[in-house]
Amino acid sequence: MKKFILFCLLFIISSCVSVKKHNEKLEIPISVEHLKKDIDFAHQKLEKLHPKLYWYISKEDLNHQFDSLKTTINKPLKPNEFYQKLAPIITNIKEGHLRLNAYDKRLTKKEIKHLKNQKGLLNRYNFVIDNDRIFVKDNVDKIPNMNVGTEILAIKDILVKDLLQKYKPLINSDGENTTFQKYSMARRWPSIFTAEYGILDSVKIEAKYQNEIKTFYIHREKIT
């Protein structure tokens, strides 16, 4: 029994260290040399493993995009800064099931337990995307100031149109079919925002409803 308890304690300590090391990597810039090697690695793996890589993009065009990306890498980048540069190339392959994910922060067991007892922040709502605009589609919990039809103008003092322009290159679809993209964006932008800014307990919102503009905060709430 003592050995089992000792094993459990060592496992917990090891898990905490692993989470810590993983999250520390998010803030460590990767050298230019290694970034360029990673670009070549991604390119080679796509050519080797993707059976229909050139259905919607020519080999010459894809090669050019990877080569062009390498010329823009002139300083070390953090993992998710690099993700923002590489992901658009993956999107340009125009294969709906092919996606590059951000390097997410890992949570400790304590953080996971804490979040399990709370409702979400942005994912409590469904949204509609109309060009560079976001509207609230539903508000099941009837959160004040987030009525159905409310237009979100800014989040965390960042204009919605700027956020969506930044996130558009990360949303892929099959071929030239762009119809699906607005629905995918409506589902995914809260997750992309969270990957970029972290798991927040509250966030500042500027919104417009019935021609009235308000600034307020939405908060996580305990599950009751």
Regions found by a protein language model. Give the residues of each.
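Flexible, low-complexity junctional segments that flank or bridge functional domains
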Residues: 17-224
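Sec-dependent N-terminal signal peptides
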Residues: 4-13
